[in-house]
Curated annotation (Swiss-Prot):
GO biological process: fungal-type cell wall (1->3)-beta-D-glucan biosynthetic process; fungal-type cell wall organization
Record's keyword terms, sorted: Cell membrane, Disulfide bond, Glycoprotein, GPI-anchor, Lipoprotein, Membrane, Signal, Transferase
Lineage of source species: Eukaryota, Fungi, Dikarya, Ascomycota, Pezizomycotina
Documented EC number(s): 2.4.1.-
Enzyme class: transferase
Family: Belongs to the glycosyl hydrolase 72 family.
Major place of residence: membrane
Protein name stated in the entry: 1,3-beta-glucanosyltransferase gel2
GO molecular function: 1,3-beta-glucanosyltransferase activity; glucanosyltransferase activity
């Protein structure tokens, strides 16, 4: 019979497959922070919508195919990202395996609650007609589906709803949706999950949009964060030529986290992603909390980092390699350092004087909540398909992976991270091409290894590293 300490150590290792790889992220002032360590969290991410909006149906979404999720999570882990954004989700589908896979990979999820299907979005030309209980079954359904995953970072209440085609009162409806989502979360969730808005880069109204959603009111309808879809840096531009210096100045006084919810101009190809060094540099990190590159998969609009082939195999494009190279240059210790000045930022009070453009509403009178929506909030969604964290049993991907030259890359697999650890560039770079040397596993710096030793959640002994746990029972 095996000694007790060996059996217990084996049990701890088994638990590692279901242990929470990440800890929830919170908003403090203008920063995202790790809820356990207090370290600042900077988004290094990609937008993830394989097939685009046309590939989404009520029976299939980006987080409903575990084999595809395992493949993509391993490739994203290798790339160095710590966050993905998903635009369209079907609440009725089972997302447990996919969400758990990304959790194990140390990758957070920012989720849009809308869908392009009938009843799943706010009509920007007639918002009153779609602000109803049918719409909120979609919204609250997404919240229910992902509320139990520690890697659910945030929810987007809207994406570019305010544009040239929208009517003037649309912002009041978006704030009302945020109010309703935050009330549902407060009433029906065990933790607070941030809610925010993703804006188009329309410069004449950009600061009005920020101020409108950032300011505080009695209804608790303000955004917890602000996303910006911006493509002003093209090719080997610069901090000043791209206008990034202007954006940095404009958002310097923001009281909530601001990040690029989309970036990566494709006018010059392949993309160099030289803006990564500016975005995570000394100047911009005072105003921005990182960003999400548009986008992971190659679609008709030609923004992809990878090409998913018809047989499920994947070809890594030059853009993938270029982005990975840019990520590898980042000083993560500086990027993640906490700043008490930023975490203590307070929002302004909502007043009409915050709005300067006459085309943008200065009214903060929100539409009344429909009675059926109030019932959903009070009692919870009656037919909720509530998700749960599950064991990640397999880390080997089934599909073949090819580099930009068409050579097969072997040995790519998912690394299940230690409890409390999120993915960082260069820490999990599995895979090698024929004739090249590679361990096929993960490589870490000394500081990464210290972090990876981490802790494993063991219900009856608290938080102990696996090595410490074994050593304890060897005494």
């Amino acid at each position: 019979m095996l000694p007790t300490y060996v059996r217990l150590f084996t049990a701890v290792c088994a638990l590692a497959t279901t242990a929470s790889a990440v800890v929830p992220i919170e908003v403090k002032g203008k920063d995202f922070v790790n809820s356990k360590t207090g370290d600042r969290f900077q988004i290094l991410g990609v937008d993830y919508q394989p097939g685009g909006s046309s590939g989404f149906t009520k029976d299939k979404d980006p987080l409903s195919d575990p084999d595809a999720c395992l493949r993509d999570a391993a490739l994203m882990q290798r790339l160095g990202v710590n966050t993905i954004r998903i635009y369209n989700l079907s609440p009725s589908l089972n997302h447990d395996e996919c969400a758990s896979i990304f959790n194990a990979a140390g990758i957070y999820m920012i989720l849009d609650v809308n869908s392009p299907l009938y009843g799943g979005y706010l009509d920007r030309t007639d918002p009153e007609s779609t602000y109803n209980d049918v719409y909120f079954k979609q919204v609250f359904g997404v919240i229910e589906a992902f509320k139990n995953f520690p890697n659910t970072l945030a929810f987007f209440a809207g994406n570019e709803v305010i544009n040239e085609q929208s009517v003037k009162n649309v912002p009041t409806y978006v704030r009302a949706i945020q109010r309703d989502m935050k009330d549902y979360i407060a009433k029906n969730l065990d933790r607070s999950i941030p809610v925010g808005y993703s804006a188009a880069d329309i410069r004449p109204i950009l600061m009005d949009t920020l101020n409108y959603f950032m300011c505080a009111d009695d209804a608790n309808s303000q955004s917890d964060f602000f996303g910006l879809n911006s493509y002003s840096w093209c090719g080997n531009s610069s901090y000043t030529k791209s206008g990034y210096d202007v954006l940095t100045k404009d958002f310097a006084d923001a009281s909530i986290p601001v990040f690029f919810s989309e970036y990566g101009c494709n006018e010059v190809q392949p993309r160099y992603f030289s803006e990564v060094q500016a975005l995570y540099g000394q100047e911009m990190t005072q105003s921005f909390s990182g960003g999400l590159v548009y986008e992971y998969t190659q679609e008709e609009n030609d923004y992809g980092l990878v090409q998913i082939n018809d047989n499920g195999t994947v070809t890594l494009l030059v853009d993938y390699d270029n982005l990975m190279a840019q990520y590898s240059k980042l000083d993560m210790s500086r990027i993640q350092a906490s700043n008490t000045t930023q975490t203590s930022a307070k929002p302004p009070k909502c007043e009409s004087s915050l709005i300067t453009n006459s085309t943008f509403t200065d009214s903060f009178d929100l539409p009344k909540r429909p009675s059926k929506v109030q019932t959903m909030i009070d009692k919870g969604l009656s037919d909720a398909n509530t998700g749960k964290l599950v064991e990640v049993k397999n880390t080997d991907i089934k599909q073949k992976i090819y580099n930009a030259n068409g050579e097969e890359i072997t040995g790519i697999k998912l690394s299940i991270l230690a409890s409390g650890e999120s993915n960082t560039p260069g820490a999990h770079s599995s895979g090698s091409t024929s004739g090249s040397s590679s361990s096929g596993g993960s490589s870490s710096s000394s500081s990464d290894k210290e972090s990876a030793a981490g802790t494993i959640s063991v219900p009856f002994v608290g938080l102990l590293s696996a090595a410490s746990f074994m050593a304890f029972f060897m005494l």
